Design a protein with these regions (language model features):
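Acidic catalytic/metal-coordinating carboxylates
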Residues: 32-36, 59-65
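Charged docking surfaces used in two-component/phosphorelay signaling
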Residues: 15-23
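The feature encodes the CheY-like receiver
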Residues: 14, 56, 86
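His-Asp phosphorelay/catalytic-motif detector in bacterial-type signaling
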Residues: 45-47, 72-77
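Short hydrophobic/Thr-rich beta-strand motif most characteristic of the beta2 strand and flanking loop
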Residues: 25-32, 40
Length: 129
């Protein structure tokens, strides 16, 4: 199915997300910090990326801007996840949120699955996230 890259420094969250995505039939990989995340994104050319908004070394906004400048990832939909920020804070901070969504941690499993399906299908959210 889809190629999905997770960039998050929380090993437990990443392990859970990888398990869910692989169970759903997706090819999924992860990076624990922004620099290796950028390298994997360039090589993998994912269909969707899941980013933690607060990581050591870079904010989600900085990583987002770098991903948008890269030809391999400039159109890739991005799902931001954070336990520390609101959707409005995040989506207002980035310059072009087109195709981007937000889920608050802890993530509810059905919300996560629905959001992934919608984003991969290019659909708009059914309700505010």
């Amino acid at each position: 199915m889809a190629k999905i890259l997770i960039i998050d420094d929380d090993f437990e969250i990443v392990s859970l997300i990888l398990e869910i995505l692989k169970h759903e039939g997706h090819e999924a990989d992860s990076a624990g910090e922004p620099v290796s995340g950028m390298q994997k994104a360039r090589a993998m050319k994912p269909d969707l990326m899941i980013l933690d908004y607060h990581m050591p070394g870079a904010t989600g906004a900085h990583l987002f801007e770098s991903l948008r400048r890269n030809t391999a990832t400039h159109n890739t939909p991005i799902l931001f996840m954070s336990g520390e920020a609101s959707p409005d804070d995040i989506l207002n901070e980035i310059s072009d949120s087109n195709g981007s969504r937000f889920l608050a941690k802890p993530v509810h499993l059905e919300d996560f699955r629905r959001t992934i399906r919608e984003m991969l299908a290019g659909e708009s959210p059914e309700k505010p996230q």
